[in-house]
C-alpha cells in the first residue's frame, strides 16, 4: 500500500511539472471612436477584430491596447476571470510588486485609450487551447535560443495581427491592412479610415534576429 501511495504521489508531482500553464487569450477591437464617445457597456464586435495576444499565465509582456507597461495575466482560482497585474515602466521583467491590479470577467468587453483620439476595445478570457491563430502575422516572445524551429512549443506570448483586415491607425488617423508570406509582410496604408482609395504599399521583412519579437506568417 505504501508503495502504491508513493507511486501515485510521484505521478501527481510529475504531472504538475509537465502540465501546461493556462492560456490567457485577448482580442483587440479597433473601431476608431474617440475616447470620450465611448460609454459602458462596451461592445466588442467580431467584425472589428484586428488581432490580439495569447499569453502563458504569468508571462511578463507588453501589448498596446491592454497595457503599455510591463504586465502579467493570471486566471482566477475559479476560472471565471482574468487578473491583470501592471508593473512600473522600469520593471522590465515584472519582478517587483505590481502598481495596479484589475480583474476582468471572462469575455467582458473593456475599453482603453492610447491617446485622446483613438480607443481600443478588448476582452480577455482563460483558455486551455493553445492553437496558434491562422491568417495572421505573429510576433513571438520565447525563452528559447532556437525559436526558428521550436517557437510553437516554447512561446511565452504571441501577438498577432490579422491579415486582410482594415485597422485604424492610431498615429495618423488613417487606416491600414497587411498581408504576409513566409518571407515578410506587405502593408497597405490609406490616408483615411476604411481602407479605400489608392494605398501606399510597403514591403517589410520579418524580424528574426532574436526570440524576443521573432516574426512569422501563420497561414
From Swiss-Prot:
It comes from the Eukaryota. Glycans are attached at residues 74, 123. Keywords: Glycoprotein, Secreted, Signal. It is found in: Secreted. One of its GO terms (cellular component) is extracellular region. Residues 1-16 form the signal peptide. This is Counting factor-associated protein C. It comes from Dictyostelium discoideum. The lineage of its organism: Eukaryota, Amoebozoa, Evosea, Eumycetozoa, Dictyostelia.
Amino acid at each position: 500500500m505504501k508503495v502504491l501511495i508513493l507511486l501515485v504521489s510521484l505521478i501527481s508531482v510529475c504531472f504538475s511539472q509537465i502540465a501546461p500553464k493556462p492560456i490567457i487569450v485577448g482580442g483587440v477591437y479597433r473601431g476608431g471612436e474617440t475616447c470620450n464617445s465611448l460609454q459602458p457597456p462596451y461592445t466588442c464586435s467580431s467584425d472589428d477584430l484586428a488581432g490580439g495576444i495569447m499569453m502563458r499565465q504569468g508571462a511578463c509582456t507588453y501589448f498596446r491596447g491592454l497595457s503599455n507597461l510591463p504586465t502579467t495575466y493570471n486566471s482566477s482560482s475559479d476560472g471565471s476571470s482574468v487578473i491583470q497585474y501592471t508593473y512600473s515602466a522600469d520593471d522590465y521583467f515584472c519582478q517587483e510588486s505590481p502598481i495596479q491590479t484589475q480583474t476582468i470577467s471572462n469575455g467582458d468587453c473593456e475599453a482603453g485609450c492610447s491617446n485622446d483620439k483613438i480607443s481600443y476595445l478588448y476582452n480577455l478570457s482563460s483558455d486551455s487551447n493553445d492553437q496558434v491563430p491562422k491568417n495572421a502575422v505573429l510576433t513571438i516572445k520565447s525563452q528559447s535560443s532556437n525559436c526558428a524551429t521550436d517557437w510553437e512549443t516554447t512561446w511565452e506570448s504571441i501577438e498577432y495581427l490579422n491579415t486582410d483586415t482594415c485597422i485604424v491607425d492610431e498615429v495618423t488617423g488613417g487606416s491600414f491592412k497587411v498581408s504576409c508570406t513566409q518571407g515578410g509582410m506587405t502593408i497597405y496604408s490609406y490616408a483615411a479610415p476604411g481602407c479605400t482609395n489608392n494605398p501606399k504599399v510597403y514591403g517589410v521583412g520579418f524580424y528574426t534576429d532574436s526570440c524576443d519579437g521573432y516574426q512569422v506568417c501563420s497561414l
